[in-house]
């Protein structure tokens, strides 16, 4: 297959899936891993894809994309993460569910539970959770965003009145030094309130968050008890070895 045709196919496959690993591209195009890596490097230099650890993503996945787009990106990985989180939450527990498509996936995975008490600033998650009549769902007040997130000073004040068992926290980016980053200062204030009001904080993040850049600092990975993700750079693995934060991969392994 000519290189130009192969590049077109790679771009199309990545756009359709949001993210594909090197191994998946090798299988789809029937070429060597070395060839795929060279192709990905060329396409990344042209800004036609976004190079990631072990694969490639659509360029738009590196930005704070629209809600519908973000929900589609890495949906399989988000669902796998959500299933692992759900295993840790017992029936009758109390928890916060944060803004974001991965916390929303967790909400969906919890529908088989009973008698959960949930506080959320995620309108989409609340809409899902109301299907279970045994749940006690409380919505935080504040300013409603177009993506269904609720933020603002009123949201922070409301969340700070609670002390719950778990906080399901999303994040926009995780820096190489373990810093937790987001795009919106007001959203970060809400996330801080969730961490402070939770006995255990469960951070949920697909692997693309390790290559994204955001400017507002929330804190450190060491501020949360668990990190649930699909894949993680070796530098973060080494960082977590010095912390109490447990790393849970979407395949269920704990490191």
From Swiss-Prot:
A GO MF term: ligand-modulated transcription factor activity
GO BP terms in the entry: glycerol metabolic process; regulation of DNA-templated transcription
Residues annotated as domain HTH deoR-type: 3-58
PROSITE patterns found in the cross-reference section: HTH_DEOR_1 (PS00894), HTH_DEOR_2 (PS51000)
DNA-binding region location: 20-39
Annotated function: Repressor of the glycerol-3-phosphate regulon.
Protein name: Glycerol-3-phosphate regulon repressor
Gene: glpR
């Amino acid at each position: 297959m000519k290189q130009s045709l192969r590049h077109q196919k790679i771009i199309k496959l990545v756009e359709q899936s949001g993210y594909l690993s090197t191994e998946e591209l090798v299988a789809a195009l029937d070429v060597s891993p070395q060839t795929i890596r060279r192709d990905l490097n060329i396409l990344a230099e042209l800004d036609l894809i976004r190079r990631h650890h072990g694969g490639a993503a659509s360029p738009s996945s590196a930005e704070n994309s629209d809600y519908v787009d973000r929900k589609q990106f890495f949906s399989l990985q988000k669902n796998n993460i959500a299933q692992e989180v759900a295993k840790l939450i017992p029936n009758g527990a109390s928890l916060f569910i944060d803004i974001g498509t991965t916390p929303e996936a967790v909400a969906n995975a919890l529908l088989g539970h009973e008698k959960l008490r949930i506080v959320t600033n995620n309108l989409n998650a609340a809409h899902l959770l109301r299907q279970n009549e045994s749940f006690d769902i409380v919505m935080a007040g504040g300013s409603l965003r177009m993506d269904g997130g609720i933020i603002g000073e009123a949201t922070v004040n409301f969340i700070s009145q609670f002390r719950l068992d778990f906080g399901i926290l999303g994040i926009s980016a995780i820096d190489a030094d373990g810093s937790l980053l987001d795009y919106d200062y007001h959203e970060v204030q809400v996330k801080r309130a969730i961490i402070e009001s939770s006995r255990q904080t469960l951070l949920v993040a697909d692997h693309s968050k390790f290559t994204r850049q955001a400017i507002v600092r929330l804190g450190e990975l060491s501020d949360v008890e668990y990190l649930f993700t699909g894949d993680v750079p070796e530098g973060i693995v080494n960082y977590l070895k010095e912390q109490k934060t447990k790393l849970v991969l979407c395949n269920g392994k704990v490191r």
